[in-house]
Design a protein with these regions (language model features):
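N-terminal Rossmann-like dinucleotide-binding module
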Residues: 1-48
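Beta-loop-alpha module in the N-terminal Rossmann-like domain of NAD(P)-dependent dehydrogenases
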Residues: 38, 51-111, 310-311
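Hydrophobic residues in well-ordered beta-strands that form the structural core
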Residues: 71, 94, 119-121, 150, ...
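Rossmann-fold dehydrogenase core element
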Residues: 107-124, 145-149
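Predominantly a Rossmann-like dinucleotide-binding segment in NAD(P)-dependent oxidoreductases
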Residues: 125-206
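Active-site beta-strand termini and strand-to-loop segments that position acidic
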Residues: 214-221, 241-243
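C-terminal glycine/acidic-rich active-site capping loop/insertion
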Residues: 245-329
Length: 342
């Protein structure tokens, strides 16, 4: 099969550093044939010397040689450029945020259906090994009924780029929180959560938030807290999971968990008689422990560059969806739930 001919709109940290870097190692599946950026010196890449340079998204989308458009512009332009590309008959991969509102998402989905094209949200961190391992352990039931999940991305440092301004839709709520919310909603499961959220601008030079504290709750659901901080020099572990049989903790480089088999423990009933010797309830727990380390570990935290593996997995899924017609592993409809939370 022929490689998919790709045009990238917005060739900055994401367009160049993430997407072009992934595609250059997948040349049998994807080929960058066009690059658009409002900064002239950004319209080229040494790995794709034949890519046509364009000054605007409109010009790139009008290129009949482009089959798929990667939208990696300022946040505020994601939905408008994606809709424009779909109307132009192109497949679309849209960076996060996948729009600001559910109306944005609905309009993109409608354009994709009308054009008969694939619309792919870039939620590649769904493929991260630590997340997938945490999800599999929770689903196995060994930790019992899950009561609490905490997901933390901590760091300490200032930013002064466009992501700290509201002008182009900056701020951590729509920059990195889409990844945490994606993980949180996957672990929340079916149904719509009650949402509480607090944000703050602490170290960023601009007014946009650099700290987000979000809580999801629901009937018969665990409390899920997703927190992103720019003022924590003592970064917390990414994962903390608590259940009725045990718990889990760790991050991208190692996870540990332990649990109790209550069927092997003495059966207890409520005893209203004061305990002899004025002691507190105490019993010896027989723990089963386990741990996991990935083959290749990624850095954690809000400022860490994404690991290449999950990005390539998403691109493999996208290639199969476009060339072979296989179902997408991450759909626009699924990501719509995340946008509703945000």
């Amino acid at each position: 099969m022929e490689p998919i001919k790709v045009g990238i709109v917005g060739f900055g940290r994401s367009g160049c550093g993430i997407h072009a870097s992934a595609i250059k190692d997948m040349r049998d599946m994807f080929d960058v044939v066009a690059i658009a950026d409002f900064i002239p010196e950004r319209r080229s890449h040494e790995a794709f010397p034949n890519a046509k340079p364009y000054a605007s998204a409109e010009a790139l989308i009008a290129d009949p040689n482009v089959e798929m458009v990667i939208v990696s512009t300022f946040n505020s332009m994601h939905a408008p450029v994606a809709r424009m590309a779909l109307k132009g008959g192109k497949h679309v991969l849209c960076e996060k945020p996948f729009g600001f509102t559910t109306a944005d998402v609905d309009s993109m989905i409608a354009e994709a259906k009308a054009a008969g094209k694939v619309l792919q949200p870039f939620q590649q961190r769904r493929f991260e090994e630590d997340f997938q391992k945490v999800r599999s352990i929770i689903r196995s039931g060994i930790l019992g009924k899950i009561s609490y999940i905490q997901i933390c991305w901590d760091g300490f440092g200032r930013r002064w780029d466009w992501q700290t301004s509201r002008q182009y839709g900056g701020g951590q709520l729509y920059n990195n929180m889409p990844h945490l919310v994606d993980h949180a909603m996957e672990l929340f499961g079916d149904g719509e959560p009650e949402v509480q959220c607090m944000v703050a601008s602490s170290l960023s030079i601009g007014p946009a938030e650099d700290e987000v504290h979000l809580t999801l709750t629901g009937k018969d659901k665990p409390i899920i807290r997703a927190e992103l901080m720019a003022t924590n020099p003592y970064a917390r572990e990414r994962w903390c999971v608590c259940g009725t049989n045990g718990g889990l903790h760790g991050g991208t480089k190692k996870l540990e968990w332990k649990y109790v088999d209550w069927s092997k423990m003495p059966k207890r009933v409520v005893d209203m008689t004061p305990l002899e010797g004025r002691v507190y309830c105490s019993e010896k727990l027989e723990w089963t422990t386990d741990s996991w380390e990935p083959v290749t570990a990624a850095d954690a935290g809000a400022g860490a560059k994404p690991a290449p593996g999950p990005t390539k997995q998403l691109y493999l899924s996208l290639y199969d969806a476009i060339r072979k017609g296989t179902p997408q592993l991450i759909t626009a409809e699924a990501v719509r739930r995340r946008i509703a939370v945000l």
